[in-house]
Amino acid sequence: MRIAGRPIELIVDVDPEIPEVLMGDPLRLSQIFTNLINNATKFTESGSITLKIKQEQVLGNNVKLSFSVIDTGIGMTSEQLQHLFNAFTQADGSITRKYGGTGLGLVISKSLVELMGGELRVESEYGKGSKFFFTITLALASQVAVPKWKSVSTFKNKNVLLVDDCER
């Protein structure tokens, strides 16, 4: 497989024990994974990028999940890791020149993970790659609460009222 025109294998490993329906924020999770996978792609010339999602524990009506993005990219030194989650900062100045980016992706991802009650962490070895990982707890959703529509025609000639309590 080629990702970004390079020989990179994408491996997706999802624990089959994870319930099909969970309540969480798919938009935030998508943003986190987009940022982490884009970074892994940016800093991996060849090798692999692995996305792992594992069920850690069932706590009543909640499920604790661990998420990780692991790459075989350039990795980072311990000094570079110290500044990794600072806004507008990349590992060093040459990174911005060579790979581009604003230095905000990881800061945003860290904030989103924290909003969901988790902590974004990283392990990295220079020249070998990096692993970004976090654990969050999501609520089990009732199967009844999630309708399965047979087709879009179900909504034909229907009116929809959308109410949002978000203040802007």
Q: What does each of the following model-derived ranges do?
A:
Residues 117-123:
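Glycine-rich ATP-binding loops of the HATPase_c
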Residues 40-41:
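Short helix-loop "hinge" at the ATP-lid/N-box region of the Bergerat-fold HATPase_c
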Residues 1, 74-75:
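Glycine-rich G1-box
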Residues 76-90:
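Short conserved segment of the HATPase_c
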Residues 4, 9-20, 56:
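Conserved catalytic submotifs in the C-terminal HATPase_c
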Residues 100, 105, 109:
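Short alpha-helical Gxxx[C/S/T] motif in the catalytic ATP-binding
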Residues 11-13, 56-63, 79, 133-164:
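Disordered, acidic interdomain junction associated with two-component signaling
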